[in-house]
């Protein structure tokens, strides 16, 4: 898969994982596991990229005597999800065209 396409898909997946509530890295990985395997190092790279793009914010809070980073989606992150939904319709249309051509031969 094209690296740019995969990066975009993973970014949106992480945003979707935190859209309904603030979350921390372990829970994000756990929530995404039924859909996609994601290593901690990959997730941290994505989280840093999304934070630097102002699509999420980070806060630190104590949990069980330890500090934990919680990630919160911003309005810009929510807009990215909505934009992705619109883009996906176009991607599906292209996919249908490509697979139709393959099947017609």
What annotation goes with each model-predicted range?
Residues 42-45, 74:
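Ser/Thr-centric signal marking residues that sit
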Residues 11, 68, 80:
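Short, flexible micro-motifs
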């Amino acid at each position: 898969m094209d690296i740019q396409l995969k990066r975009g898909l993973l970014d949106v997946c992480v945003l979707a994982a935190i859209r309904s509530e603030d979350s921390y890295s372990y829970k994000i990985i756990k929530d995404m596991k039924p859909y996609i395997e994601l290593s901690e190092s990959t997730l941290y790279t994505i989280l840093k990229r999304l934070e630097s793009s102002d699509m999420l914010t980070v806060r630190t809070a104590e949990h069980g005597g330890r500090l934990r980073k919680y990630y919160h989606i911003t309005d810009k992150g929510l807009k990215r999800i909505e934009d992705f939904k619109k883009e996906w319709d176009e991607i599906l249309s292209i996919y249908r065209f490509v697979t139709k051509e393959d099947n017609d031969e």
